[in-house]
Amino acid sequence: MTEIHVLDNLASVDAAQWDALIADGNPFVCYAFLRGMEEHGCLRHDYGWQAHHLAIYHDDKLVAAAPAYLKGNSHGEFVFDFSWANAFERAGGDYYPKLLGAAPYSPVPGPRLLATNDTDKRKLVAGLVAETERLGLSSAHVNFLLEADLPAFDVRWLQRFDWQFHWHNRGYRHFEAFLTGLTGKKRKNIRQERRQASDSGLQIAMEAGSTISDSDWRALHALYETTFDMKGNHAAMTLPFFRHLGRSLGDRVQVATARMDGRIVAMALFMVGNSTLYGRYWGSVVEVPGLHFELCYYLGIEFCIANQLQTFEPGAQGEHKMARGFLPTRTHSRHYLVNESFDLAVRNALVHEAHSREAYYEELMEHSPYAPTRPRP
């Protein structure tokens, strides 16, 4: 018998059955990552997160799932709907809570409908709609989903897209081979930035999560917090969660470190999927020219080349990434708005937004670091 369950945490779920549904090894929807955030204080109600996962069981075996959350705000999502919320509430509605299918705090494209067939994916989408209407919510949203999941959503869901800057491995054998594909100006600039970092006197390396000591995890987390403190934001990921990642994911966590007399003074933390490297967190207590680019981008590119990974996704936003070999790549989201008048207004606005974002892509590609320009994604 097939049953759909709604879960307020993943404690009752078999980790192996959950992870078996993730075809691409995406670490941000794996059991250890999602359950770790629940267990180690990252998903707090006062931060606006309440787990509301969907799980489909057949004869007591998990056959499909959707990580989902009731959201009391739009923070930590990176698909911005603040203007939608303001408009809906000015009209007298309650936009929050809403239902969100996502990897919390992670603007990373990946599977959001964890299933091995299209039928179960459509059941998950229907489940999101049913929960939205059962709870009397304003809306449901699914952010940063893969193209393979898009057909599961019918026309009632609004389509939205944006751009991130990703690096693609063209079979490079080493970093210099990558540089040869760039324009001369970009190649010269990257070499200069790498030289600045190497001449700093800092010990720079990529370190596997399984080798990081407890004291180094404390140092890494303190650097992560520093970045958020500088911007006046709260750092949601806790030190116990960082330690948990090192224990549970091991070498699927990689950290680019800069050390001074053995002490970590700057870092960039990465996660590794089957074919993709994901850049997530950066922090530093030193100001060294070129160091940010070395840790966040160039060591990551070298890691991808050495390990034959096909894609490097260094994080959301940042046009400066283009000058360092990253090209605009389309990301997708889907949105279900219950109120039909509100749906129509947003649907019309998204048509104009799409035209603007297509024009933005054309403008960006006029400044491609590669010659000749690559085909459109």
Explain the meaning of each model-derived region.
Residues 1-377:
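N-acyltransferase acceptor-side catalytic subdomain
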